[in-house]
């Protein structure tokens, strides 16, 4: 049932709350860290906690239902239409990453969704699309470059990053590590000559 890094308990726990999962936080982390998509809260929008999403309509039974009510607001829908399918695909994993098929109240977990027009049953069905999307972009190169050099890329690094990404070509992580550590930016920095 576990499918790669996204289903490891450490990732799932860090992107959850202590008392419940947070599909929004999980999806935000995936988009920011694997796709380099910066997400910021919308301005001038009062964002209620999911526990408050039931309002006058009665109690919310599970996270999916809470997000559906939350997404009913036009101010929230534009981001949540993107975030929720990704985050809800991980609902089979509780706040500490243990696999589950039902919520504490007994409702069955529904981890289905649609991502970029393709339906999936759970994270296992979504991972191939996410991996393909991440590999086709420059984000993995940029993230590893930042980690290896212990700094965010500057304007001067854009050409280097483009070259690294092109040479990597969406190959394996080992291939990407090799491209970064053999780059002039990394090798010269290690000798104290690069920024």
Where are these regions (language model features)?
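Active-site substrate-binding loop specific to GH73 endo-beta-N-acetylglucosaminidase modules
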Residues: 1-148, 158-173, 178-195
